[in-house]
Amino acid sequence: GDFLDETAFMVNALAGGSDTHDIADDVMRELHFLERLEPDLVFLGNHDERAYMLLDHHKQEVKFAAQGVVDDIERLVKGELKAELVPYSGVTGGGTWSKKSFRALGNSMAFCHGFTYGLGAGEKHCLFTGMSTVFVHTHCIEVRPVRSLGDAYGYNIGFIGDVEKMHYASRREKTMTWANGWASGEYGD
């Protein structure tokens, strides 16, 4: 998730109060990255969801731009890559967190973009899924054991963005904990 930044679709940017980035450049570069990666499973994150949330916007030019981004995402992921596009629901998706937003690997490991943040985010994700969970939502790297009868861990794997280009987060103390990371490996249940 969050393969697109979509800073131009943030509420503050739409109101003209933020330094916006070129949405076309963002989409072109990031979809090219996905194309080279060739995943068979793509999670939408809260950044990617910005375009989907604007499909019913009251300004036609915003709605039109958002529809173009959504069409480009779905054309690449579902069409060219033949990959599954996993929706992002966050904690408010339909009123509650949705199982549609994660994929389980066996009976003990879940993957999701993520939806909760702060200290203990890894543990919170595991409590929601009922198993060890790998996520990226907070942009930090952390492995956290979960207080449970099972042997669950929350794996927060960081992100692959450029922190220096994320101006909207430059004044947040939490941004100092952001780190680049990538997870890969083999799994046996």
For each feature predicted by the language model, list its residue ranges:
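Metallo-beta-lactamase
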Residues: 64-108
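Generic detector of short, locally flexible boundary/turn motifs and exposed helical patches
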Residues: 8-12, 67-70, 97-101, 118-122, ...
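A short, terminal or domain-edge coil/loop segment
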Residues: 46-59, 92-108, 143-151
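Core catalytic region of metal-dependent phosphoesterases/phosphodiesterases
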Residues: 1-80
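Conserved beta-sheet core of the metallophosphoesterase superfamily
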Residues: 108-188
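A structural signal for short, well-ordered beta-strand segments and their strand-loop junctions
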Residues: 39-45, 93, 111, 134-135
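Feature recognizes metal-dependent phosphohydrolase scaffolds
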Residues: 3-16, 21, 35-41, 97-100, ...
